[in-house]
């Protein structure tokens, strides 16, 4: 039995779950998410908990069990509390701002980089150098934050670039060079 898959998912007070075959919909104060589950996985609602089980003991069913339980738990978490990723810009003159549904980054290129954000994602800029990506879909929040970071990942010599708040950047020593005469 999957150690993660066998744990029940607690449903908060204001969260409603609808299960129709392999389609599961979760509705809460922050919004609504739905996902289609593989045919090897079944979800049952018991009072204020959800149980994820597998249909048989085949290897693919065992592989998907813990994954599907975590995906459903993230849906419940997202519609009740939401998710957030914070990024910081490190570098002289690096700035971020929002304009409509676009994030505009000035990160040392000859032009500002515009990143449209998908529906269901909110992006806020704190100060000029902290970007907050939030939403109810954990996967979408993480992918959007990764796309922003990929514009200018931190470089190992000076540490300039876009990084997650709290991320440790491995630094390298520069060239030592020979002594000048």
UniProtKB/Swiss-Prot annotation:
The superkingdom listed in its UniProt entry is Bacteria
Q: Which NCBIfam families does the UniProt entry name for this protein? A: L6_bact
Q: Which organism is it from?
A: Synechococcus sp. (strain JA-3-3Ab) (Cyanobacteria bacterium Yellowstone A-Prime)
Q: List the disulfide bonds.
A: none
Q: What does this protein do?
A: This protein binds to the 23S rRNA, and is important in its secondary structure. It is located near the subunit interface in the base of the L7/L12 stalk, and near the tRNA binding site of the peptidyltransferase center.
Known partners and oligomeric status: Part of the 50S ribosomal subunit.
Indicate what this protein is called per its UniProt record: Large ribosomal subunit protein uL6
What Pfam family is a match for this entry? Ribosomal_L6
Q: Which GO terms describe its cellular component?
A: cytosolic large ribosomal subunit
Single Gene Ontology BP term? cytoplasmic translation
What gene is it encoded by?
rplF
Q: Name one GO molecular function term.
A: structural constituent of ribosome
Q: Which UniProt keywords apply?
A: Ribonucleoprotein, Ribosomal protein, RNA-binding, rRNA-binding
Question: HAMAP family of this UniProt entry?
Answer: Ribosomal_uL6_B (MF_01365_B)
Protein family membership? Belongs to the universal ribosomal protein uL6 family.
